[in-house]
């Protein structure tokens, strides 16, 4: 219960660190990756991330994604050579756990103080 309250407060005060995404077929199928909206990611999320984390994105970094129920997932965040950003690795664990399908809408909140993404 406390996690939900904290998340709601974060959403109200940190709305500039939220990106929205309508899932495509490739986000939920065997490709095992979520394509993150580049413009929004670079505008809202990257400036809030630690410099060292941003510098390592080409090599890929492990980040934590939490849902509103407190479940925690470790995914790989990577920047491809084409400049696009993806969640990879355990992304499909989230898809299966949440039952996501094409055209579902999700929001990602970057919690700068804890260096964690929240998926809502």
Swiss-Prot record:
Q: Name one GO molecular function term.
A: DNA binding
Q: Which residues bind DNA?
A: 19-120
Q: Which Gene3D superfamilies match?
A: DNA-binding pseudobarrel domain (2.40.330.10)
- UniProt keyword list: DNA-binding, Nucleus, Transcription, Transcription regulation
Which InterPro entries does the annotation name? B3_DNA-bd, B3_domain, DNA-bd_pseudobarrel_sf
A Pfam family this chain is assigned to: B3
Top-level taxonomic group = Eukaryota
Where is this chain's protein located in or outside the cell?
A: Nucleus
- Please provide one cellular component term from the Gene Ontology annotations of this protein: nucleus
Q: Which CDD domains match?
A: B3_DNA
Q: What is this protein called?
A: Putative B3 domain-containing protein At3g28853
Q: Which organism is it from?
A: Arabidopsis thaliana (Mouse-ear cress)
């Amino acid at each position: 219960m406390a996690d939900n309250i904290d998340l709601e407060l974060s959403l109200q005060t940190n709305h500039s660190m939220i990106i929205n995404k309508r899932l495509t077929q490739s986000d939920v199928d065997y490709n095992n990756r979520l394509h993150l909206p580049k413009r929004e990611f670079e505008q809202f999320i990257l400036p809030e991330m630690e410099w060292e984390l941003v510098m390592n994105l080409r090599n890929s970094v492990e980040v934590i994604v939490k849902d509103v129920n407190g479940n925690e997932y470790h995914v790989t965040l990577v920047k491809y050579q084409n400049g696009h950003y993806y969640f990879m690795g355990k992304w499909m664990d989230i898809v299966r756990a949440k039952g996501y399908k094409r055209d579902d809408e999700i929001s990602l909140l970057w919690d700068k103080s804890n260096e964690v993404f929240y998926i809502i």
